[in-house]
């Protein structure tokens, strides 16, 4: 009998639970944007861009990559930093669009969505602040 020399590394969601929560939030936002093709209606010149499924797809891909990074045992600091900065940019764009729509349409749910995006953005900033910046 040959002895199996493979080492199986244990994957734990307890290592980076905030990253998993952020990744799930991004996947949720992406699904909402993909499922609703007429979510954004203002400004008129940007509606095709904002309602494109590519925007929702980017949210989903970044969310999945953040979850994958958090479950991986070879966590690279540069990858984490880049994913979190891209997330901040996406959330800032989304929150700005939500507030603009709320102002133009007067619909309170757009303001609510904008505030929720800001809260997730602040959560992202807190993760960035707590994350390692370099190898020590």
Labelled PLM ranges:
Residues 118-136:
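Membrane-water interface at the C-terminal end of transmembrane alpha helices
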Residues 1-26:
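Cytosolic juxtamembrane helix and N-cap/initiation of the first transmembrane helix
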Residues 18-19, 43-61:
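A loop-to-helix transmembrane entry motif
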Residues 16-23, 76-87:
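Membrane-interfacial loop-to-transmembrane alpha-helix junctions, especially the N-terminal start
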Residues 34-42, 71, 96-104:
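Juxtamembrane "helix-exit" motif on the non-cytosolic side of transmembrane helices
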Residues 59-73:
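Canonical alpha-helical transmembrane segments
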Residues 8-13, 72-80:
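Membrane-interface helix-boundary motifs at transmembrane edges
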Residues 74, 78, 85, 91-113, ...:
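Membrane-helix boundary connector in multi-pass membrane proteins
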């Amino acid at each position: 009998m040959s002895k199996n020399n493979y080492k199986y590394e244990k994957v734990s969601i307890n290592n980076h639970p905030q990253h998993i929560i952020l990744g799930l939030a991004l996947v949720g936002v992406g699904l909402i944007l993909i499922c609703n093709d007429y979510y954004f209606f203002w400004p008129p010149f940007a509606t095709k861009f904002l309602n494109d499924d590519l925007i929702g797809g980017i949210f989903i891909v970044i969310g999945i990559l953040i979850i994958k990074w958090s479950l991986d045992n070879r966590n690279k600091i540069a990858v984490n930093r880049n994913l979190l900065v891209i997330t901040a940019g996406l959330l800032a764009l989304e929150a700005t669009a939500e507030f603009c729509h709320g102002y133009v349409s007067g619909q309170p749910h757009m303001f609510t969505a904008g505030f929720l995006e800001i809260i997730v953005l602040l959560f992202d900033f807190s993760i960035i602040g707590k994350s390692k910046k370099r190898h020590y």
